[in-house]
């Protein structure tokens, strides 16, 4: 046991001593994020070989696409991925012990006149992943990319006419689900800028693109039509008061980068009303889902709501991004996504508890209680330690920005719960005497 623990501890340090970095930005990204990445892989019981492979892929294929290392004063591309505009986020499926990460690929042209809205860097990043693992299929990615992101002419026009103000500039992200020593690649696409270019709403673009796809792939059509009917009925009777019948708006879309016969489409909806009745409505599609599995999942949602002590209210996304190091004083809207499975007439919901801005120790304790109640004993015993060791120099009792979202779904009589986590300046940061500090609970270096 002692030898195994020692071997685990050596992965990040061994790779750090072995790796050469193309520049200081990449070196800083590695030492800022890899300690937490390693700790999560250990918590989820990945083998030593898998840890080396995933951290190696991260260093060689992902870090070169994270752009300049963020500081308070330096110019950088701001990503919608986090409230601080950082382009990388780790997440953990606690029920299946699967580590994931999401990033927005950035390259030297991003934000310049060559690619003012970061439309094209993702293609370069994809080439790296295709080289490292077989089975990646770009058919649906290419389709949605064409339908929902800017082409070169649209990008040039919006930039030259200065038409982009406070809109979400992120157009696409990549995510890797780490299964054993392999990964499953998926994409997330935001059509906000396409909406500006075409004059169509995000809702029209998202649902229109999936509707057209469903005409060709009829196996997802019944689920799509049920979801569309739900959204239309909700929005027909939406209000702006404190009822749960607020307007549902499309935010983004995702799909797996595998064969279209196996790929899933997910449509994400923003729910401004944070309340248990609103979440129940999202979960049941306004009463359209009423089978036993739905009811069992609903009971767990109610349990989580109570454990987390969620504060209800009407929310909106604040603007602009939070400065690095800022302590949040905000709570965000809720969200849900709906998976369109082949040959399943009912969309599968996944709801999100927006816990960003809530006390992280209280969230951790609530999750640990949930894990114990549902006999996820291994995760219950490790979760708190994983986060403490990821941020060892922080006053964990006072933090309120480590947890961003908690997602929940329930299928085949089994719950699935994931946490989405702040993944910046982790481990014994700063590693170097000249290291930059943005998040430091003990002192705040205002010069960085």
From Swiss-Prot:
Binding site for substrate: 100, 186, 188, 264, 266, 268, 350, 352, 416, 420
Name of the encoding gene: dmaW1
Listed GO biological process terms: ergot alkaloid biosynthetic process
E.C. numbers: 2.5.1.34
Binding site for L-tryptophan: 80-81, 89, 190, 251
Superkingdom of origin organism: Eukaryota
Name of the featured protein: Tryptophan dimethylallyltransferase 1
Keyword check for Chloroplast: no
Pfam families per the UniProt record, alphabetical: Trp_DMAT
GO MF assignments: tryptophan dimethylallyltransferase activity
């Amino acid at each position: 046991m002692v030898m195994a623990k020692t071997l685990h501890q050596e992965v990040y340090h061994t790779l750090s001593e072995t790796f050469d970095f193309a520049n200081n930005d990449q070196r800083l990204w590695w030492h800022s994020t890899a300690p937490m990445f390693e700790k999560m892989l250990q918590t989820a019981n990945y083998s030593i070989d898998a840890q080396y492979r995933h951290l190696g892929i991260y260093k060689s294929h992902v870090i070169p696409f994270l752009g300049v290392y963020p500081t308070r004063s330096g110019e950088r591309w701001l990503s919608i991925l986090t409230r601080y505009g950082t382009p990388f986020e780790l997440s953990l499926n606690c029920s299946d012990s699967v580590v994931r990460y999401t990033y927005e690929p950035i390259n030297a042209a991003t934000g310049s006149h060559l690619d003012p809205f970061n439309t094209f860097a993702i293609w370069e990043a994809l080439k790296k992943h295709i080289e490292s693992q077989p089975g990646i299929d770009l058919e649906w990615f290419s389709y949605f990319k064409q339908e929902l992101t800017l082409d070169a002419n649209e990008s040039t026009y919006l930039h030259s006419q200065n038409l982009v103000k406070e809109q979400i500039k992120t157009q696409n992200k990549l995510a890797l689900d780490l299964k054993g020593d392999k990964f499953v690649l998926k994409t997330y696409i935001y059509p906000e800028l396409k909406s500006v270019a075409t004059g169509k709403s995000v809702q029209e673009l998202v649902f229109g693109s999936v509707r057209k796809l469903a005409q060709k792939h009829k196996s997802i059509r019944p689920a799509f039509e049920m979801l569309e009917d739900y959204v239309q009925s909700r929005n027909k009777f939406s209000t702006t008061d404190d009822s749960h019948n607020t307007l549902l708006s499309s935010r983004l879309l995702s799909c797996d980068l595998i064969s279209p016969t196996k790929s899933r489409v997910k449509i994400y909806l923003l729910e401004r009303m944070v309340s248990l009745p609103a979440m129940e409505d999202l979960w049941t599609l306004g009463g359209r889902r009423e089978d036993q599995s739905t009811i069992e999942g609903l009971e767990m949602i109610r349990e989580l709501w109570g454990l987390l002590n969620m504060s209800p209210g009407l929310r909106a996304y604040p603007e602009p991004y939070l400065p690095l190091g800022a302590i949040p004083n905000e709570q965000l809207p809720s969200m849900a996504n709906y998976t369109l499975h082949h040959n399943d007439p009912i969309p599968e919901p996944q709801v999100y508890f927006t816990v960003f801005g809530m006390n992280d120790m209280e969230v951790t304790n609530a999750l640990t209680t949930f894990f114990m109640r549902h006999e996820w004993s291994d995760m219950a015993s490790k979760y708190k330690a994983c986060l403490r060791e990821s941020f060892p120099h922080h006053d964990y009792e006072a933090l309120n920005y480590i947890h961003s979202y908690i997602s929940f779904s329930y299928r085949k009589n089994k719950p699935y719960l994931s946490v989405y986590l702040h993944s910046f300046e982790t481990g014994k940061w700063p590693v170097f005497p000249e290291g930059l500090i943005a998040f430091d609970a003990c002192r705040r270096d205002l010069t960085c």
